[in-house]
From Swiss-Prot:
Stretches the record annotates as Disordered: 289-459
The organism's place on the tree of life at top rank: Eukaryota
Name of the protein described by the UniProt record: Histone chaperone RTT106
Origin species: Kluyveromyces lactis (strain ATCC 8585 / CBS 2359 / DSM 70799 / NBRC 1267 / NRRL Y-1140 / WM37)
Phylogenetic placement of the source organism: Eukaryota, Fungi, Dikarya, Ascomycota, Saccharomycotina
Gene: RTT106
Keyword Transmembrane included in the entry's annotation: no
Known partners and oligomeric status: Interacts with histones H3 and H4.
Subcellular location: Nucleus; Chromosome
Key word Transmembrane present: no
């Protein structure tokens, strides 16, 4: 196995190997694609390191600061506690976002009016006291790692009060959000707040827990965007980019969703709670996204010639074992012409001719079973031969008993060996020495003695 396959996720590796099994020469193409992507990634890392190095010498004067958040947890593009500033670049007087540590600039986004494409506040699913600030932007003409900041509501409220941006009695974090949004507008970009009451009244934003491959994350459904986060890579989709959606792997508890973009890319998100289906389906319908769950390409494919389906394989196995004939036996259905006749036989009241035919059939079946047993003796080991012989002896004894009963009553139904006339029973018992004389005396019912019972007294 080529080394690059080991670095792919399990699901992606299986897909690649499936294609390679059909087209062995394609492995070299996959290798080239992997190398190209790796070289591009290494180049991006080198560029980022160079840019971070060049910003180490920069500093932001206090008079150029428009707004700042001190000691907040930055998760991307860096991962550390930093002070985030919206300031004016001294070189060209354009607004910028600066990430500082001890008054040194570690990362900067220049000309935020053009570079910031989308920014929003998002709820932190596990903790109500935290909120995300997410920002998607371009750098040097390409999408860079998005900005993701975790804001502690109590900490931010405290900072705002210390700067006299809020009154001492204010405790609503929404006041901080509104202030930050106004400052962003002043510098040329907007921060949306889709989960605020005013927006929720007109558009229902929501989020669901899910998996992207082996990575657990959250899928946010916003008015004009869908975001998956927040483990890298963070994915952002514009609603208008989504061409279709499919639902799959539907179980009693969970289901999968696959987003298909207009350029044909597919992004599958799995293990979504069934309770969220109605919200997702309503969102899809409002955005007029096509549901391709029942499209021809997703339907079960017809087996190719030479291939045996699971159903036909099962059928073949049943035929070999003889089980299929038993399963397909005739039922005593009312529409069946033989319904009444078979029903009569079941209680032993059939005609004599039918009984004889059934008896012959019984004998034939016994003979067939004995023949099958004889054939099986050649294939079975010694233990199985002994068991077969015992079964044959039992069958012979049963057959002898049936013959005795049949001789006693030729018209008896084989399906019920004891369905004979009442007056024939004594003859049969006497023939086998089973009748003994029991002396009895009949009591005179005309005597005056009080008696109980049947009126028969035994000596």
């Amino acid at each position: 196995m080529p080394n690059f396959l080991e670095k792919l996720s399990e699901s992606l590796r299986e897909k690649v190997l499936h294609i390679v099994s059909k087209e062995p020469d394609s492995i070299s193409i996959f290798q080239e694609v992997y190398n190209c992507g790796k070289d591009s990634q290494d180049e991006d890392i080198d560029n980022k390191k160079r840019k971070l190095t060049t910003t180490d010498t920069l500093s932001v004067n206090d008079e150029n600061v428009v707004f700042e958040l001190q000691d907040v947890s930055v998760l991307s593009p860096l991962r550390k506690k930093l002070t985030v500033l919206i300031a004016v670049d001294e070189r060209d007087q354009s607004p910028m976002i600066s990430f500082n540590k001890n008054n040194n600039v570690e990362y900067v986004i220049n000309n935020i009016k053009q570079s910031v494409k989308f920014s929003t506040f998002l709820p932190f699913p596990e903790k109500k006291n935290l909120v995300y600030l997410y920002m998607n932007y371009e750098r040097d003409g390409s999408n860079a790692d998005p900005v993701l900041i975790t804001l502690n509501k109590e900490q931010i409220l405290k900072q705002f009060k210390e700067r006299n941006l809020l009154k001492a009695e204010d405790s609503d974090f929404q006041l901080c959000v509104d202030y930050m949004r106004r400052q962003a507008i002043l510098t040329g970009f907007r921060i949306s707040d889709p989960f605020s009451k005013s927006v929720m009244d007109s558009h229902h934003s929501f989020f669901v827990d899910c998996h992207r491959g082996s990575k657990e994350g959250t899928l946010f459904f916003l008015p004009e965007h869908i975001i998956f986060g927040f483990k890298k890579p963070i994915l952002l989709f514009e609603s208008k980019q989504i061409d279709a959606i499919t639902y799959s792997s539907i179980t009693r508890l969970t289901f999968n969703v696959t987003l298909i973009t207009k350029d044909g890319e597919r992004f599958e998100f799995s293990m979504i709670d069934q309770n969220k289906f109605s919200e997702i389906d309503e969102y899809v319908k409002k955005k007029q996204v096509e549901d391709k769950s029942m499209s021809d390409e997703l339907k079960a494919k017809t087996p190719k010639s030479g291939q045996t389906s699971d159903q036909s394989a099962l059928k073949e196995a049943l035929e070999e074992s003889g089980t299929l004939d038993t399963m397909n036996g005739e039922s005593d259905d009312e529409d069946d012409q033989n319904f009444e006749e078979e029903s009569d036989l079941s209680d032993g009241s059939g005609s004599g001719d039918d009984d004889e035919d059934d008896d012959d059939d019984d004998d034939d079946e016994d003979d067939d079973s004995i023949e099958k047993g004889d054939d099986g003796e050649e294939e079975e080991d010694d233990n199985e031969e002994e068991e077969q012989e015992e079964e044959e002896k039992e069958e012979q004894e049963q057959e002898q008993n049936r013959q005795i009963l049949n001789r006693a009553s030729p018209n008896a139904a084989p399906s019920n060996h004891f369905s004979m006339e009442i007056d024939e029973i004594p003859d049969l018992l006497d023939e086998n020495g089973l009748i003994q004389d029991i002396p009895i005396t009949m009591d005179d019912d005309n005597d005056e003695e009080e008696e109980e019972g049947s009126g028969v007294e035994y000596d």
